[in-house]
Design a protein with these regions (language model features):
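Loop/turn-to-beta-strand initiation segments
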Residues: 217-220, 261-265
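Conserved AAA+/SF3 P-loop NTPase catalytic/coupling segment centered on the Walker-B
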Residues: 219-242, 257, 276-283
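Positively charged interface segments
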Residues: 77, 193-195, 200-209, 231, ...
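P-loop NTPase catalytic core of nucleic-acid-dependent motor ATPases
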Residues: 31-56, 99-100, 105-219, 288-291, ...
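A short, contiguous, amphipathic alpha-helix enriched in charged residues
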Residues: 20-25, 190-195, 230-247, 399-400
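Phosphate-handling catalytic cores of nucleic-acid transaction enzymes
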Residues: 310-352
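Intein modules and their embedded homing endonuclease domains
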Residues: 2-128, 260, 285, 373, ...
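Replication-associated primase and helicase/ATPase modules
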Residues: 1-34, 44, 49-52, 128-144, ...
Length: 457
């Protein structure tokens, strides 16, 4: 009997004394047998970030269930919390020169290392197969969806999303009239990126200060049906697109912290991404706007197309990697067709009609030695908007937009302009008034004059 007791005690783990579990010793023993660290609010293993702690808790339970102790669920919770302290590392920066895949690591120079020996921030659920056949179905789909000169831009952008880097400082919007099949791209990308991709909303990101924290550790955020409303704020969106290091993140009910942000933004929409107040060049310069072809009237849609294209994911990986290598060779400058550039300019002009006003005829004239007061210029602008059925900007917005356009149109904003009353006011050098909307007694009065019937011939 004594020998059996001694044998059972000898077989017991070091963290169990026969009556209770030593949680600290269990953590040391568990971490000694598993590659796992904790940083930036998440566990990381050789398979990437642990997105769900349930499998980890299940593995701990399998080791604890042999010990007849009470309240095992609480023990497991205590162990997980203790493990966060025991496995804590100060920092775990992203590695932008490699792509961790299901069977190894692919480097930007094209070399490949098999196996998963190291703990990584993210790992894509795709096998690297250099002999994978070309994704013919995927390429045929893109050929029917986009213009041929725009496909390299999409190829580079998808490749750009494979690495945790924001050096390209661009987001992408693919717009169409509906029914073209744009959303099929998102379905295929979910198979390529797995848990490293998230469905989100650019509108939510722009207005919710907690939304950025949801994109931590994510490579790609896809807005499958972007809202048509103009963004009231653009600073959150711009900060994500241009982030090249840690940024301030905030979760509800918790103190803000510094976290790595590498998420790229891809949106599908029936319209343009507009800003309600931000008319700066920077907001529009960061957009790659692709236009989908119109859907052929005789096209028959395949409901299983996405699943068929997902079967080509190994070939799609090679296709995207070729785009990434091309982007890196161009120093992260995207290939843009003339159509893409014109799309971006059209979006910018649609949200800021000041450019069209400055280039109009019959209202003002660009002349180097001329000048106009800000008030007179705005009155002429309102007249131009009224006669062209356009919505006029507010006075301050108009002035700010005109100041921003000074460099492009060789204008100068100064306070040395003399108005009709002889007072020195703010205005612009380089603009001459052609129309005179204030010749009537009332600025908003109609240009037509009412004539009583008795006076008519």
């Amino acid at each position: 009997m004594a020998k059996n007791e001694q044998s059972r005690e000898a077989n017991q783990p070091i963290w169990f004394d026969g009556k209770s579990i030593n949680e600290a010793l269990f953590c040391d023993d568990f971490l000694g047998r598993h590659k796992i660290i904790y940083t930036n609010g998440a566990f990381f293993t050789p398979d990437g970030r642990v997105t769900d702690e349930l499998p980890l808790r299940g593995e701990i339970f399998e080791e604890l269930k042999c010990c007849a102790v009470s309240n095992i669920p609480r023990k497991i919770s205590n162990i997980v919390e203790l493990m966060k302290l025991a496995a804590l590392v100060e920092d775990f920066p992203p590695e932008a020169d490699r792509i961790h895949l299901a069977n190894g690591t692919l480097f930007l120079d094209g070399s490949f290392t098999e196996g998963k020996p190291d703990i990584v921030r993210c790992r894509l659920p795709v096998l690297y197969n250099p002999d994978a056949p070309p994704p013919t179905r995927w390429l045929a789909f893109l050929d029917g969806l986009l213009y041929s000169e725009d496909i390299p831009t999409l190829q580079e952008f998808i490749g750009y999303c494979l690495i945790p880097s924001n050096k390209g400082q661009r987001m992408m919007v693919i717009k169409g009239n509906g029914g073209e099949g744009k959303s099929q791209i998102g379905a295929v990308l979910s198979a390529l990126f797995g848990s490293n991709m998230k469905d989100g909303s650019i509108g939510k990101i722009s207005e919710n200060r907690f939304a950025r924290a949801d994109l931590e550790h994510i490579l790609l955020c896809v807005d499958d049906d972007m809202r048509m409303e103009a963004l009231r704020q653009t600073n959150y969106v711009k900060s994500i697109v241009t982030a090249q290091g840690k940024m301030d993140l905030e979760r509800k009910g918790k103190q803000s912290y510094q976290g790595w942000m590498c998420a790229r933004l891809l949106a599908f929409s029936n319209g343009d991404l507009q800003a309600l107040f931000d008319r700066s060049d920077g907001f529009y310069r960061r957009q790659l706007v692709l236009t989908a072809k119109e859907k052929p009237a005789d096209r028959v849609d395949d409901p299983d197309l996405a699943e068929k294209m997902k079967a080509e994911v190994e070939g799609i990986l090679l296709w995207a990697f070729a785009g990434l290598q091309q982007l890196v060779a161009n120093n992260f400058k995207f290939t843009e067709s003339q159509r893409t550039k014109e799309n971006r300019e059209a979006v910018k002009r649609d949200n800021n009609n000041v450019f069209d006003f400055l280039e109009s005829e019959g209202y003002i004239r660009l002349k180097a030695d001329a000048s106009i007061s800000s008030k007179d210029c705005y009155d002429i602008y309102r007249m131009w908007c009224e006669e062209n059925s356009l919505t006029a900007l507010k006075r301050r917005s108009f002035s700010d937009a005109l100041v921003a356009a000074c460099g492009k149109y060789n204008l100068e904003h100064c306070n040395t302009i003399t108005n009709s009353a002889g007072r020195r006011v703010w205005g612009f050098m380089g603009i001459e008034a052609v129309a005179r909307p204030h010749i009537n007694e009332f600025t908003d009065a109609s240009q037509c004059t009412y004539v009583p019937e008795d006076w008519r011939d």
